[in-house]
Regions:
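CN hydrolase (nitrilase-like) catalytic-core segments centered on the catalytic cysteine
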Residues: 59-82, 151, 157-260
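A conserved C-terminal secondary-structure "cap"
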Residues: 271-298
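Short beta-strand scaffold segments in enzyme catalytic cores
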Residues: 83-85, 97-100, 143, 241-243, ...
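Short beta->alpha transition motifs characteristic of CBS
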Residues: 51, 99, 110-117, 242, ...
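Short beta-strand segments enriched in small/hydrophobic residues
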Residues: 1-8
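Active-site catalytic loop in hydrolytic enzyme cores
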Residues: 60, 72, 89-189, 193-203, ...
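Short, active-site-adjacent cap segments at secondary-structure transitions
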Residues: 43-46, 89, 224
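Active-site beta-strand/loop signature of hydrolases that rely on acidic residues for catalysis
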Residues: 3, 17, 25-54, 74, ...
């Protein structure tokens, strides 16, 4: 199955961002992609660099204008399309939500980001409520979304640092792990620190694929986005979107600075082959992991 991840640079022009996303999705579909994933919050600039109540105006309902447009695009191109939105769930209640549109344009499912960061330049707790542990008719927040191309273990950005999230998706039968992302460097970081951060980000996601015997798709944004005048120094998003296999092998990788339609033909049967020789799920000591639900083992 041919998959595509979209690496895009954004501007303050919401309409232009969506037009550009659509053009890149069309490019991917023209090259035979059946599953296409956009980056985190692809409709706008990364507004979480500062805490500003006016930014809540960017939020929209699901279903809403963006899911309608993405659904029409998925139906026209006969693809499964993964988008990422600032969701207004109710008055005063907002989420960072990934959406999956089926080939017929219907909404196959949503995933509300579970782990919410609050770091300099990434003030997401101001805007986003964490996803519910259980939603969508009682399903766990870490439940794959069933589609015509497989069961998608869809997570979002900061979730990618947590092995528990990937494991729970795998235990629920995910065929692949997907991470729409918005991450980059602070301009004040020196080159050595930047390289350490990038290497850690790539390594941990590939490790989730290895530990669970699954392919991994990662879509990050690229380009420099200045902070608002009362904010910080801006963020240089580091791109490097990639696709890796169930042994962590690189299948495709973008560079840091270019808008990219990254494609690869993945074989979902390889997970069966890999899990036979590396039977991690078989050898888990489920009787010994109770303390994983503790905040800390005091």
């Amino acid at each position: 199955m041919r998959v595509a991840v979209i690496q895009q640079a954004n501007s303050a022009d919401l309409a232009a961002n969506m037009d550009r996303s659509e053009a890149l999705v069309r490019d991917a579909a023209a090259q035979g992609a059946e599953l296409v994933m956009l980056q985190e919050l692809h409709r706008s600039l990364y507004f979480c660099q500062t805490e500003d109540t006016d930014c809540f105006d960017l939020a929209e309902t699901i279903p809403g204008p963006s899911t309608e447009r993405l659904g029409q695009l998925a139906r026209e191109l006969d693809i499964v399309l993964v988008g990422s939105l600032f969701e207004k769930r109710a008055t005063g209640l907002y989420h960072n939500t990934a959406v999956v549109l089926e080939r017929d344009g219907s909404l196959a499912g949503i995933y509300r980001k579970m782990h919410i960061p609050d770091d300099p330049g990434f003030y997401e707790k101001f805007y986003f409520t964490p996803g519910d542990a259980r939603f969508n008719s009682g399903a766990s927040g870490f439940t794959p979304i069933q589609t015509s191309v497989g069961k998608l273990g869809l997570l979002v950005c900061w979730d990618q640092w947590y092995p528990e999230a990937a494991r729970l998706m795998a235990l629920a039968g995910a065929d692949m792990l997907l991470y729409p992302t918005a991450i980059g460097w602070a301009p004040a970081d020196d080159d050595a620190e930047k390289q350490r951060q990038l290497n850690a980000w790539i390594t941990i996601q590939r490790a989730h694929g290895i530990a669970n015997g699954l392919p991994v798709l990662v879509a990050n944004r690229t380009g420099f986005e200045a902070a608002p005048p009362d904010g910080g120094d801006g963020i240089q998003f580091w791109g490097n979107s990639f696709i890796s296999g169930p042994q962590g092998e690189f299948l495709a990788q973008a560079d840091a600075d270019s808008e990219t339609v990254l494609l690869h033909d993945i074989d979902l049967q390889r997970s069966e082959t890999v899990r036979r020789i590396w039977p991690y799920l078989r050898d888990r000591r489920i009787d010994a992991y109770e303390d994983l639900t503790c905040r800390f083992r005091d």
